Amino acid sequence: MGLLRIMMPPKLQLLAVVAFAVAMLFLENQIQKLEESRSKLERAIARHEVREIEQRHTMDGPRQDATLDEEEDMVIIYNRVPKTASTSFTNIAYDLCAKNKYHVLHINTTKNNPVMSLQDQMRFVKNITSWKEMKPGFYHGHVSYLDFAKFGVKKKPIYINVIRDPIERLVSYYYFLRFGDDYRPGLRRRKQGDKKTFDECVAEGGSDCAPEKLWLQIPFFCGHSSECWNVGSRWAMDQAKYNLINEYFLVGVTEELEDFIMLLEAALPRFFRGATELYRTGKKSHLRKTTEKKLPTKQTIAKLQQSDIWKMENEFYEFALEQFQFIRAHAVREKDGDLYILAQNFFYEKIYPKSN
């Protein structure tokens, strides 16, 4: 090679180096393409093997037990917190139930009491788990979280929920009790005739707008323990956080309801197929708005935010929001201002023993 450099003119040497570099780049490119082709082939073989295994299991004959197919045996519980867009979301479930072939049932408790007696807890658990005629089922109602496992149930229902900024939720509830909403405008409300604004209520130290009224989302997630309903309990908040992470399939926020619906449709299409499109383009009959609602002033908000109860409820809300946004970030991608659900991003390979 050294002799060649001596004998070759500089221009030819440069051309030789360039030609060698181009050849190496070409080879690297071809190797990369071969690697990609090999990976695609491995994935295709893996998918084929999975299909063969599934077919073999299908050909083995019907399942020996008499239980329903898993999707047909599914039960969802939406233990809805008042004034979190719960009626708007529930009406989407009602709009889809005939088309998607599932049942929707409202859990109506006496005086809307979110805490059930022990005997009612047992009845409720037995009803939901054994009522096969109502499966697949979507149950909704203003009931605090109930741990099915402690009643000896093997297959627990899927819990979902939506929560809201605690002050916004309280303001909405305050005006709802006085003026109702556009969903049932003729219904007489409990506080109808009271024209006092939320700002005036807070300024006067009224009971309907007291910080204690903020304590609702934490106990709904905490459950049926007495400490859950002890206003300002740190234990209750910690338990609510634990349940949100470990016992709830998905918890959305009112402020991002469409994204919550989109994630449910992607993960649970048996119930929510078509829900996103219905929410975006439907006649909006499912939407519900409190009437005569006036936004609170900055002074009113600042006064409520001085409360330790608000601080805890807000901490729980921020915790739920962060978890929801984490789930969404791993499930969707944004393009041209719109969100798109990601396709399946895993596959199986190296499946043994090999099929004949």
Curated annotation (Swiss-Prot):
Which parts of the sequence lie on the Cytoplasmic side of the lipid bilayer? 1-11
Grouped into one coarse class, the protein's main location is Golgi
Q: Which GO terms describe its biological process?
A: gene expression; heparan sulfate proteoglycan biosynthetic process; heparin proteoglycan metabolic process; ureteric bud formation
> Which keywords appear in this protein's UniProt record, sorted alphabetically?
Coiled coil, Disulfide bond, Glycoprotein, Golgi apparatus, Membrane, Signal-anchor, Transferase, Transmembrane, Transmembrane helix
Lumenal face residues:
29-356
Top-level EC class as recorded in UniProt: transferase
Segments spanning the bilayer are 12-28
User: What does the UniProt function comment say about this protein?
Assistant: Catalyzes the transfer of a sulfo group from 3'-phospho-5'-adenylyl sulfate (PAPS) to the 2-OH position of iduronic acid (IdoA) or glucuronic acid (GlcA) within the heparan sulfate (HS) chain and participates in HS biosynthesis. Required for metanephric development of kidney formation, suggesting that 2-O-sulfation within HS is essential for signaling between ureteric bud and metanephric mesenchyme.
Protein family membership: Belongs to the sulfotransferase 3 family.
Complex and partners: Homotrimer. Interacts with the C5-epimerase GLCE.
Q: Could you identify this protein by its name?
A: Heparan sulfate 2-O-sulfotransferase 1
Organism, by scientific name, is: Pongo abelii
